[in-house]
Swiss-Prot record:
Name of the protein this chain belongs to: Glucose-1-phosphate adenylyltransferase small subunit, chloroplastic
Entry keyword annotation includes Glycoprotein: no
Its job: This protein plays a role in synthesis of starch. It catalyzes the synthesis of the activated glycosyl donor, ADP-glucose from Glc-1-P and ATP.
Pathway(s) per entry: Glycan biosynthesis; starch biosynthesis
Species, as recorded: Arabidopsis thaliana
Keyword Zinc-finger: no
Family: Belongs to the bacterial/plant glucose-1-phosphate adenylyltransferase family.
The entry's keywords: Allosteric enzyme, ATP-binding, Chloroplast, Nucleotide-binding, Nucleotidyltransferase, Plastid, Starch biosynthesis, Transferase, Transit peptide
GO molecular function, one term: glucose-1-phosphate adenylyltransferase activity
Transit pept. (range): 1-71
One Pfam assignment: LbH_GLGC
Gene3D superfamilies per record: Hexapeptide repeat proteins, Spore Coat Polysaccharide Biosynthesis Protein SpsA, Chain A
């Protein structure tokens, strides 16, 4: 996203919307600033920066009641009035989540944000990429469970001088730690941030951007932050429009005519659910879509002004552990300005095996996937691995995504996602499945030794059939194995046998061995 210093012409549009009293505010005449980036001196850039800031503040002063606009994730027509050096004024804080029990066994040996996604990526790449695409390059990731692989991935994927040495960008993991002042591990999202406030306040920023590490979506945080500043909010909560069917599974919010949050309800039902209906046209939906989506749910994504965050966590709610259920409703009760900001794009909370499975298979959807990794205007970044192209020999592959470095021989793959370095042998059938691949290749010598010992190499063996399953990394699936859940078992824990079944989806554990001839 271009900074102001890289834009040749900046137009500040007239503002003539009505305020809450019904009186039209004074229109601000359109002003155009023109300059050439190739000849603009350093002093001129500083002057331009301050001029843009004054113009933006002028618009806000004359228009005190501004409702945050509809946020469309792939919109190309936005113009923000953010500080050109946005990365220095916002600190990104990504919450890595707890033990990830609902995603077990995928979280058996890794933190939830480190779970592989979409053949080439990991979950953590989504919020980090959204930050980088929004010119936010100072990012912390808070975690306390199995953080080794997450730390390794981040150190390899994101350079220590992101954004250039001037911006001092970084992506750094902060693991839970005990100290004489606080002997406890993280007790929740708010407590995790509280324990590292001493570090966060060292950064001279205006806002903290609080993000979740297990969501799949593409969002322009610059628009989010712009709306926070324009409404003079203390806290801004990203909100997702909901229909009645889905609304009962989320924490809902009620807003007034200015988009200010006045009430919260956790997974309401019946009459309580009906009472949470809102006019979502206030936040930018058209009349038809507002009728279909009369509820707004919190996405667990917040912009919090720096001083407000410090006061809430240290003074107002020193014992609160969670943002969504304690701190944010508490801030509303104190009379702070807590605004809703509508995000009307694809969003998925990847907190369960079923949600994770559906999100991955969703990228194979025709003609347009639920989430696209092919948007060059807002790319998803990850670790460069320098793997060779995938090799497919007499393979029949349809409606699938194949990662880098795979070797696929004379097999059938349909509606599946195949991860890095996957090896699939002759006669295998892969349907409606997610294969995470492998961390390394085995040599021919190693495979011969395994065969001599009666063991199985990494990958999918000959004539094996995999259907509606997740195969974690480095799994060894023997020949003539059937993982098809023909009995339609919904829940089963067979950890000693190398697999679990959740919501009818078979998940083979990382590094597991499924012997030749096994039927699941």
């Amino acid at each position: 996203m271009a900074s102001v210093s890289a834009i040749g012409v900046l137009k500040v549009p007239p503002a003539s919307t009505s305020n809450s009293t019904g009186k039209a505010t004074e229109a601000v005449p359109t002003r155009t600033l023109s300059f050439s980036s190739s000849v603009t001196s350093s002093d001129d850039k500083i002057s331009l920066k301050s001029t843009v800031s004054r113009l933006c503040k002028s618009v806000v002063r004359r228009n005190p009641i501004i409702v945050s606009p509809k946020a469309v994730s792939d919109s190309q027509n936005s113009q923000t009035c953010l500080d050109p050096d946005a990365s220095s004024s916002v600190l990104g804080i990504i919450l890595g989540g707890g033990a990830g029990t609902r995603l077990y066994p995928l979280t058996k040996k890794r933190a939830k944000p480190a779970v592989p996604l979409g053949a080439n990526y990991r979950l953590i790449d989504i919020p980090v990429s959204n930050c980088l695409n929004s010119n936010i390059s100072k990012i912390y990731v808070l975690t306390q469970f199995n953080s080794a692989s997450l730390n390794r991935h981040l150190s390899r994927a994101y350079a220590s001088n992101m954004g250039g040495y001037k911006n001092e960008g970084f992506v750094e993991v902060l693991a839970a730690q005990q100290s004489p002042e606080n002997p406890n591990w993280f007790q929740g999202t708010a407590d995790a941030v509280r324990q590292y406030l001493w570090l966060f306040e060292e950064h001279n920023v205006l806002e903290y951007l609080i993000l979740a590490g297990d969501h799949l979506y593409r969002m322009d945080y610059e628009k989010f932050i712009q709306a926070h500043r324009e409404t003079d909010a203390d806290i801004t909560v990203a909100a997702l429009p909901m229909d009645e069917q889905r609304a009962t599974a989320f924490g809902l919010m009620k807003i007034d005519e200015e988009g200010r949050i006045i009430e919260f309800a956790e997974k309401p039902k019946g009459e309580h659910l009906k009472a949470m209906k809102v006019d979502t046209t206030i936040l930018g939906l058209d009349d038809q879509r507002a009728k279909e989506m009369p509820f707004i749910a919190s996405m667990g994504i917040y912009v919090v002004s720096r001083d407000v965050m410090l006061d809430l966590l240290r003074n107002q709610f020193p014992g609160a552990n969670d943002f969504g259920s304690e701190v944010i409703p508490g801030a509303t009760s104190l009379g702070l300005r807590v605004q809703a900001y509508l995000y009307d794009g694809y969003w998925e909370d990847i907190g369960t095996i079923e949600a994770f499975y559906n999100a991955n298979l969703g990228i194979t959807k025709k003609p347009v996937p639920d989430f696209s990794f092919y948007d060059r205007s807002a790319p998803i970044y990850t670790q460069p691995r320098y793997l060779p192209p995938s090799k497919m020999l007499d393979a029949d592959v349809t409606d699938s995504v194949i990662g880098e470095g795979c070797v696929i021989k004379n097999c059938k793959i349909h509606h599946s996602v195949v991860g890095l370095r996957s090896c699939i042998s002759e006669g295998a059938i892969i349907e409606d499945s997610l294969l995470m691949g492998a961390d390394y290749y085995e040599t021919a010598t190693e495979k011969s030794l395994l065969s001599a010992k009666g063991s199985v190499p990494i990958g999918i063996g000959k004539n094996s059939h995999i259907k509606r399953a997740i195969i974690d990394k480095n799994a060894r699936i023997g020949d003539n194995v059937k993982i098809i859940n023909s009995d339609n078992v919904q829940e089963a824990a067979r950890e000693t046998d190398g697999y679990f079944i959740k919501s009818g989806i078979v998940t083979v554990i990382k590094d597991a061995l499924i012997p030749t001839g096994t039927v699941i």
